[in-house]
Amino acid sequence: MSKSTSKILVIDDDPDFVAAVTPILKSALYEVVAASNPKEAKEKIFAEKPDLILLDIMMDSLFDGFSLCHAIKTSKEFKDYKDTPVIFVSAVKEIAGTRFQFKGDEEGMAGPDDYIDKPVKPDDLLARIARLLKQ
């Protein structure tokens, strides 16, 4: 898949993060679509058919990102998008002293394809996206 035709959906309730990451993605010729909450994200997934999703873990509640990722990867509602790569982004590296680690579907929760800490490093973000879009 050519990155010049790839569409990335950025799902984050922080408008500053969306404003910061959008020019990074556009500089690499990605088309960028944004959503600020899970409800809007679902609408954008169906309307825009993204090639990759950048998903904030914590939005209105702690589990919004986890729940949405699990739905995308496993529910019948999103069956056409279950193979869409999802990268979690978050400023929170730990909850109760436990570092986030994602190795696939553990304990019934389908995880993301990758994880990146905020603030993102542009080169690192673009390299991860390119790797996932080539799979």
Name these PLM-found stretches:
Residues 1-7, 80, 117, 121-135:
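Non-catalytic signal-transmission and effector/linker regions of two-component phosphorelay proteins
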Residues 12-13, 118:
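Acidic di-acidic motifs
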Residues 15-33:
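Two-component/phosphorelay signaling modules centered on CheY-like receiver
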Residues 34-52:
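Acidic, metal-coordinating helix/loop segments flanking the phosphotransfer/catalytic sites
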Residues 36-40, 63-70:
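Acidic catalytic/metal-coordinating carboxylates
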Residues 56-57:
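Active-site residues of response regulator receiver
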Residues 63-67, 77, 82, 92-116, ...:
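Alpha4 helix (beta4-alpha4-beta5 surface) of REC/receiver domains from two-component response regulators
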